[in-house]
C-alpha cells in the first residue's frame, strides 16, 4: 500500500515537471516569433528609410541644379502684361469702331407724319433717351426725346412743350433753355402720340426706361424692355447695383470723353451699341427672367 502511494506521488511529480517544460517551450516559441516579427519590421523600415534618403538626395540635386541655372541666367519675366488701351475720347471714333454712321449735331430730327407711319416697321428694336425738366409741384416732365433705330441712326428727336408751367429747365442736365423750348418745342400730346406709334410692340433699349416711360405717360410690355439699369452685367462692380450710363460706357465700351455734356443723340446711340454688343447674353437674361429658361452664354 505504501509503495503504491509513493509511486503515485512520483508520477504526479513527473507530470508536473513535464507540464512546466511544456509551458517553457511555448513561452520560448512566442518570444522567438516576436523577435522574428521585429526583425522583419526593422528590415522593412530600413528599406523605406533608404528609399526616402535616395529621394531626398535626388531632390537636393535638382534644387542645386536649378539654383545654378538661375544664377547663371539673367532674370526675364514670362508673364505677359496686357497693356490697357487708352480710353476713347471722341464719340465719332466710337461710332466708327461699331460701324455706326450718325452725325451728331444740334439739329432736331422731325420726320413727317407719313415717315412716322413707316418707322415702326423699319427696325427690330429702338433706343430712346429722354431729358426731364421740372414743372410746378416739384414734378418732372418730358423736355426732350430722342429715338434711334437698330443701325444707330437718329430717326426722331423733338423738344417738348409741357402742359404745365416750367419751373426749372435743368439746363446742366438737359441742354434746354426757355428760348429753345418756346421756339422749337412741340406740344406734349403730339409727341406722345408719335413716339407711341414708332415704338409700338418693339424691343425698347435705354437707360432707366421706367423713368422715361413714366414721363412719356406711356405703357410698354416689360418683356420688351432692355433697360441697362436692370441688366446685371452692367451693375456697378463695387456696389452690385445699377450704374450710370457714363460708367457703363467707360467700363463696357472704353468710352470716356473729357466732357460728358447733356446729349440725347450720343446717349441714344450708346444704348444701341451696348445692346448690339451684348445682345445674345442680354436676350438670354430676359428669357430666363420672364420665361424661366436657363441662361445659355455659349
Curated annotation (Swiss-Prot):
Pfam families: RNase_T. The keyword Cell division does not apply. SMART domains: EXOIII (SM00479). GO terms for molecular function: exonuclease activity; nucleic acid binding. It is found in: Nucleus. The keyword Nucleus applies. Residues 1-73 form a coiled coil. GO terms for biological process: rRNA 3'-end processing. It comes from the Eukaryota. Its EC number is 3.1.-.-. GO terms for cellular component: nucleus. Keywords: Coiled coil, Hydrolase, Nuclease, Nucleus. Gene3D superfamilies: Ribonuclease H-like superfamily/Ribonuclease H. It is an enzyme of class 3 (hydrolase). Residues 125-275 form the Exonuclease domain. Belongs to the REXO4 family. This is RNA exonuclease 4. It comes from Dictyostelium discoideum (Social amoeba).
Amino acid at each position: 500500500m505504501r509503495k503504491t502511494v509513493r509511486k503515485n506521488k512520483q508520477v504526479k511529480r513527473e507530470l508536473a515537471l513535464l507540464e512546466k517544460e511544456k509551458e517553457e517551450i511555448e513561452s520560448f516559441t512566442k518570444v522567438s516569433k516576436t523577435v522574428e516579427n521585429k526583425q522583419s519590421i526593422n528590415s522593412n523600415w530600413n528599406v523605406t528609410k533608404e528609399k526616402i534618403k535616395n529621394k531626398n538626395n535626388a531632390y537636393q540635386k535638382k534644387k542645386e541644379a536649378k539654383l545654378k541655372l538661375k544664377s547663371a541666367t539673367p532674370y526675364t519675366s514670362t508673364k505677359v502684361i496686357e497693356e490697357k488701351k487708352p480710353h476713347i475720347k471722341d464719340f465719332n471714333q466710337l461710332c466708327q469702331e461699331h460701324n455706326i454712321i450718325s452725325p451728331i449735331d444740334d439739329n432736331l430730327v422731325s420726320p413727317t407724319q407719313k415717315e412716322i407711319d413707316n418707322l415702326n416697321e423699319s427696325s427690330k428694336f429702338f433706343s430712346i433717351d429722354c431729358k426731364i425738366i421740372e414743372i410746378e409741384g416739384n414734378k418732372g416732365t418730358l423736355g426732350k426725346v430722342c429715338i434711334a433705330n437698330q443701325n444707330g441712326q437718329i430717326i426722331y428727336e423733338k423738344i417738348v412743350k409741357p402742359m404745365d408751367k416750367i419751373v426749372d429747365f435743368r439746363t446742366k442736365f438737359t441742354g434746354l433753355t426757355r428760348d429753345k423750348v418756346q421756339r422749337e418745342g412741340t406740344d406734349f400730346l403730339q409727341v406722345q402720340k408719335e413716339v407711341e406709334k414708332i415704338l409700338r410692340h418693339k424691343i425698347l433699349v435705354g437707360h432707366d426706361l421706367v423713368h422715361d416711360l413714366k414721363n412719356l405717360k406711356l405703357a410698354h410690355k416689360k418683356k420688351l424692355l432692355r433697360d441697362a439699369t436692370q441688366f446685371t452685367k452692367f451693375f456697378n462692380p463695387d456696389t452690385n447695383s445699377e450704374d450710370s450710363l457714363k460708367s457703363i460706357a467707360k467700363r463696357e465700351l472704353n468710352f470716356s470723353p473729357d466732357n460728358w455734356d447733356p446729349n440725347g443723340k450720343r446717349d441714344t446711340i450708346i444704348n444701341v451699341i451696348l445692346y448690339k454688343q451684348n445682345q445674345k447674353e442680354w436676350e438670354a437674361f430676359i428669357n430666363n427672367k420672364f420665361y424661366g429658361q436657363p441662361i445659355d452664354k455659349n
